[in-house]
Amino acid sequence: MTRSDLAAAFDDGPALVSYVVAGDPTPAATAEYIDALVDGGTDVIELGLPFSEPVAEGTTIQNAIKRALDAGMTPDAYLDLVARIDADVPVVCMTYYNLLFQYGDRAGPAAFVSAAAEAGVSGFVVPDLPVDESGPLREACRAHGLDLVFVVAPTTTADRRERMLDLTTGFVYVQGRVGTTGAREEVSAATPDALAALQHTDIPKAVGFGVSSGEQAREITASGADGVIVGSAYVDTVADGVADDDPPSVVADRLRDLAAELKAGAARGVPEPEHK
Amino acid sequence: MSTNTDDTTRTDGTFGDYGGQYVPEVLMPAVEELTDAYERYVLDNEDGFVDDFRQRIRSFGGRPTPLTHAPTLSQRHGVDVYLKREDLLHGGAHKLNNALGQVLLAKYMGKDRIVAETGAGQHGTATAMACAALEMPCEIYMGRTDVNRQRPNVFRMRLHDADVNPVTVGSGTLKEAINETMRDWATNVADTHYVIGSVVGPHPFPSMVRDFQAIISEELRAQSREQLGELPAAVIACAGGGSNTMGAFGAFVGSASLPGAPAGTHEPAPDVDLLAVEAGGSRLGVDDDAGYAPNSASLSTGTEGVLHGARTKLLQTETGQIVESHSVSAGLDYAGVGPELAHLVDTGRITPTNVDDDAALAAFHRLSRDEGVIPALETSHAVAALDQYDGDGPVVVNVSGRGDKDLDTVIEASAANDIDAAPDMEVFEQ
């Protein structure tokens, strides 16, 4: 199997995976934010397709999803947005299973995966779809050459972890702490243990949940991660911009700076440039 | 008809196409641990768990609840109508069957904290009662809107020393309360058990909640044989999430399993018609643009999808966003329904129907006036559905709960909607 775009994004040192919610607060603003995040050093864009019942999200992303839905974001508008992205980085679609299930024929994920592949999506992260229920989505992803990224949690047992490592493609999403998404000050003590348990795999390992600063990014890559995933810290920045009525370009500048800080922090965690 | 007619069958948590375990990975180990505990303690009665449960639901809960003949209702409908009196269970609703069972199970599992969601507050109060009785710390999540309109239940939970956390996100009702409870569980998963309030959620919840609630239909079968000399021709129950529904139907379907049941009370009884009555609200249908359904009729009008851990029938938009539902009865106001019910509707074993707000209000007043029983507004939907019953054998209506909690709503809505059957209250207005 040839290496996917997603896996290749981790080849040149620690990767920065940056998450924003599509359509928060408008599709045009999201497009501008994505350009800024890539400018700041983002290697993978994780673009949230908003669902009304986001059980894995903390308050920050719940509110962003509400803003995006209130502004009219839909799966079709999402795919249009993805198709318009110029930046040369892979885009991972992060959403909940019901939206994939309902698209097109309303009978499973195949129709959405096909449309997503067409629009330029490289893979999926679906937080309410554990590996146990992932058969139909895996099959659809395989048919279209897309990756399906599984989340390894701090509670994940050894046998579940090995099952996921067998099936995950692109990278493995290491959930850095129990609970929901949301920016935190500290790196969870669970993170080094989680990474140690994944040492035996060649699949790139990216840590998410709670990462918000360059210093945290440094700690995480120093613990052996191949990348960091940041979401709520960006979304907080977007929310502040909405609250203060700042123009999207101003918000985009802040996002670029934050991405640059995170990327530099992640790079600092690795003693020398690493070439796999 | 059912896929699980054998009591000893270990299900994989699917009912035809429905069910499953659609939850974040962080919860999956807890879900697997719970599945194992369900199979050992509930299905196999390990350590005498089910004996313990049966003893406590009698001595603390007040089981068995009676099966009461309703003479005036019988005359009105031209068939013998009986009422299964879950309104007389401790707490005033069937909810305690499940809450006591799950809190006790959590104790057997060595968990030391309980969380639960509640809509109208009935499941929250039942869980708080069970936790007080079994000395378990308890936190309840309840939508802000529901906190405001169900104050007495908030006080009841507080009296039992439960913490009540208002949920402000979204419309502040049951759906958001479930989301927030799942988030708490995902954060405190090692020591916490989530007592889900209906036959919804990931496996094993739909099966386990059904089994605890099926003590209703187990009793009902024994009482029918004794009092009617035969099984009823039909059982009618309201359906929101569906816990009283599966409780009233479970033993007849044959899928429920609770060790220690009297012989023959859990064998499939395909000749008994089962009618699940949903909230038709003010009208049927989904308003796609507004993301709103003026009803809660997911079983009779919904489409297949995935919500709160299971594949089931849902009220959703064309693109798959879950809509806000509506019913005059807060306990039926939910956009999803238990996956086993969805399956049993597809196989034809259960007949789904719905009753609108006004018909439920009228039935509320009829039962109060004619039979001396004030039913919950949820139950009132099942009573109203007697009008749709065209069989001639005896019928049992499951009185899922008592209506004291609904008096404010009923008086207000009866005046606003001009319900003929309502008593004149005007003279008491200031």
UniProtKB/Swiss-Prot annotation, chain A:
The keyword Amino-acid biosynthesis applies. The keyword Cell membrane does not apply. One of its GO terms (molecular function) is tryptophan synthase activity. It is an enzyme of class 4 (lyase). Pfam families: Trp_syntA (PF00290). GO terms for cellular component: cytosol. Its EC number is 4.2.1.20. The active site is at E46, E57. Pathway: Amino-acid biosynthesis; L-tryptophan biosynthesis; L-tryptophan from chorismate: step 5/5. One of its GO terms (biological process) is L-tryptophan biosynthetic process. Keywords: Amino-acid biosynthesis, Aromatic amino acid biosynthesis, Lyase, Tryptophan biosynthesis. NCBIfam families: trpA. Tetramer of two alpha and two beta chains. The alpha subunit is responsible for the aldol cleavage of indoleglycerol phosphate to indole and glyceraldehyde 3-phosphate. HAMAP family: Trp_synth_alpha. This is Tryptophan synthase alpha chain. It comes from Halobacterium salinarum (strain ATCC 700922 / JCM 11081 / NRC-1) (Halobacterium halobium). The gene is trpA.
Swiss-Prot record, chain B:
GO terms for biological process: L-tryptophan biosynthetic process. Its cofactor is pyridoxal 5'-phosphate. InterPro entries: Trp_synth_b_CS, Trp_synth_beta, Trp_synth_beta/beta-like, TrpB-like_PALP, TrpB-like_PALP_sf. It is an enzyme of class 4 (lyase). It catalyses: (1S,2R)-1-C-(indol-3-yl)glycerol 3-phosphate + L-serine = D-glyceraldehyde 3-phosphate + L-tryptophan + H2O. Pathway: Amino-acid biosynthesis; L-tryptophan biosynthesis; L-tryptophan from chorismate: step 5/5. GO terms for cellular component: cytoplasm. The modification N6-(pyridoxal phosphate)lysine is found at K95. Belongs to the TrpB family. Tetramer of two alpha and two beta chains. This is Tryptophan synthase beta chain. It comes from Halobacterium salinarum (strain ATCC 700922 / JCM 11081 / NRC-1). The gene is trpB.
